[in-house]
């Protein structure tokens, strides 16, 4: 088997995680911490790309990595237009949408830009893999009860699909041949119904849908939410923070640290026990609903993300859903590995790279 060396880039708000992989094997993994004062000099996130590029190249050089030996560079996908899952070649249309913040401004938008900037100088391909805007929802799943208010697909696509592929391999099947319910449990929680390689329905774990999580409110009583919004007590930004950042465990018990909450549960704290059970209850309820999307024909239920390390939480969820299908636990997430594997599938010609194309108001993916 030929050796493919891949540089992987995952930008965060104040750090950039990089990895160098020889096929699936990590040669280097490092988190580059950026000085907040240095970052603060830039008016827009996108203006940081040159600074981050030079920092990445310096770190690679310090570790003796010869970039001329790279076969591809893969960046984290940013806030693009809705696209189907897969590995995409970074092209001009994508770069324009990333730079302009078509669907929002976020550090992840730098992923594709940095990959392209480094790869183009080496005459090798630049890719992104399964960004959060992956949208494979069926038309029936998009309808809400208010005209003009469509349900949107925003979820942990990279980790959900990477773990789904691993589980398929463990079951000696292709991802495209299975029906899986994949639950990512981290700062946000998303439950995806994976039908033959497509996520045909998933809760919007960012904007108030589904189970509450360590720092997100999830689905809340809408009537009471409307009353709160128009009470005159809160600004818009304060209400948004109640849903994302200051919701969930933060609102209910004062911390987003699930380990601390578990310690409280183990000491017999009745409030912590009830709240932690409630989070597990809501996750299980979401999984149950998603099972109906797949007509109950489920090959496996998969639990992943940082919270999947919690035996208390996992056991509570299992008790309620293991009658639906076998529950497989893959705790944690490895975004660098997932990005490398996405690029590798293309380099090995196991998949064709997809092209990001903008046609008037719609984006289509062409394999």
UniProtKB/Swiss-Prot annotation:
Broad class of enzyme this protein falls into: transferase
Gene3D superfamilies reported for this sequence: 3.30.420.40
Which stretch is the leader sequence? none
Localization recorded for this chain is: Cytoplasm
Q: Which GO terms describe its molecular function?
A: acetate kinase activity; ATP binding; butyrate kinase activity
The record, for Pfam families, names: Acetate_kinase
- What name does this protein carry? Probable butyrate kinase
**High-level lineage:** Bacteria, Bacillati, Bacillota, Bacilli, Bacillales
Question: What gene name is listed for this protein?
Answer: buk
């Amino acid at each position: 088997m030929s050796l493919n060396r891949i540089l992987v880039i995952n930008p965060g708000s104040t750090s950039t995680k990089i990895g160098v992989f020889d096929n699936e094997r990590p040669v280097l993994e490092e988190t580059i911490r950026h000085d907040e004062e240095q970052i603060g000099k830039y008016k827009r996130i996108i203006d940081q790309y040159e600074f981050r590029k030079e920092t990445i190249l310096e770190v690679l050089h310090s570790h003796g990595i010869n970039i001329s030996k790279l076969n591809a560079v893969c960046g984290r996908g940013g806030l693009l237009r809705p696209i189907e899952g897969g590995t995409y070649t970074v092209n001009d249309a994508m770069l324009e949408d990333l730079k302009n913040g078509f669907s929002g401004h976020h550090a992840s938008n730098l992923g594709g830009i940095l990959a392209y900037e480094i790869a183009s100088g080496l005459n090798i391909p630049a890719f992104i893999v399964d960004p959060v805007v992956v949208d494979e929802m069926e038309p029936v799943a998009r309808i809400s009860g208010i005209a003009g208010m469509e349900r949107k697909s925003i979820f942990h696509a990279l980790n959900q699909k990477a773990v789904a592929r691993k589980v398929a391999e463990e079951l000696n099947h292709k991802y495209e041949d299975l029906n899986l319910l994949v639950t990512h449990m981290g700062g946000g929680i998303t439950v995806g119904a994976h039908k033959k390689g497509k996520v045909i329905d998933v809760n919007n774990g960012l904007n108030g849908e589904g189970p509450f999580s360590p720092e997100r409110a999830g689905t809340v009583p809408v009537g009471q939410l409307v009353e709160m919004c128009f009470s005159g007590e809160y600004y818009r930004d304060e209400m948004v923070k109640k849903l994302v950042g200051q919701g969930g465990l933060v609102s209910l018990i004062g911390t987003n640290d699930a380990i601390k909450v578990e310690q409280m549960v183990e000491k017999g704290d009745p409030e912590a026990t009830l709240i932690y059970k409630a989070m597990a209850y809501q996750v299980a309820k979401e999984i149950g609903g998603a099972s109906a999307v797949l007509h109950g024909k489920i090959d496996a239920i998969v639990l992943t993300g940082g919270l999947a390390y919690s035996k208390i939480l996992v056991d509570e969820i299992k008790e309620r859903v293991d009658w639906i299908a076998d529950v497989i636990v893959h705790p944690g997430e490895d975004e660098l590995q997932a990005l490398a594997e996405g690029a590798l599938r293309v380099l090995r010609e196991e998949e064709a790279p997809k092209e990001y194309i903008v046609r008037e108001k719609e984006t289509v993916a062409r394999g």
